[in-house]
Swiss-Prot record:
Bilayer-spanning residue ranges: none
Domain of life, source organism: Bacteria
Entry protein name: Aspartyl/glutamyl-tRNA(Asn/Gln) amidotransferase subunit C
One BP annotation, GO: glutaminyl-tRNAGln biosynthesis via transamidation
GO molecular-function term, one example from the UniProt record: ATP binding
Catalytic activity: L-glutamyl-tRNA(Gln) + L-glutamine + ATP + H2O = L-glutaminyl-tRNA(Gln) + L-glutamate + ADP + phosphate + H(+); L-aspartyl-tRNA(Asn) + L-glutamine + ATP + H2O = L-asparaginyl-tRNA(Asn) + L-glutamate + ADP + phosphate + 2 H(+)
Record's keyword terms, sorted: ATP-binding, Ligase, Nucleotide-binding, Protein biosynthesis
Organism the protein comes from: Streptococcus suis (strain 05ZYH33)
EC number of this enzyme: 6.3.5.-
Record carries keyword Protein biosynthesis: yes
Family, per entry: Belongs to the GatC family.
Amino acid sequence: MKISEAEVRHVAKLSKLEFSDQETAEFATSLSKIVDMVELLNEVDTTGVAVTTTMADRKNVLRADIAQKGESREELFKNVPESQDNFIKVPAILDGGGDA
């Protein structure tokens, strides 16, 4: 399956990314190769292979959900370049909130 440069530009726009024409062409080629490799899986004969739900030999391994005392606000904000009203202030990345 060929991924077109128009499709790469569309997904990049939705992701708020910008690529040069050369990068767009390279991504289209790379993504097309990846999709082709994945499509090869459709050719694998799985007749007689038991259906599985997981390939991992472990079940969910979770830690106990125990509250722990965190650092003080002063300690956390020690390396923050800019803050406002007890929040970390970061540069805006979306103009007017974006359209996504």
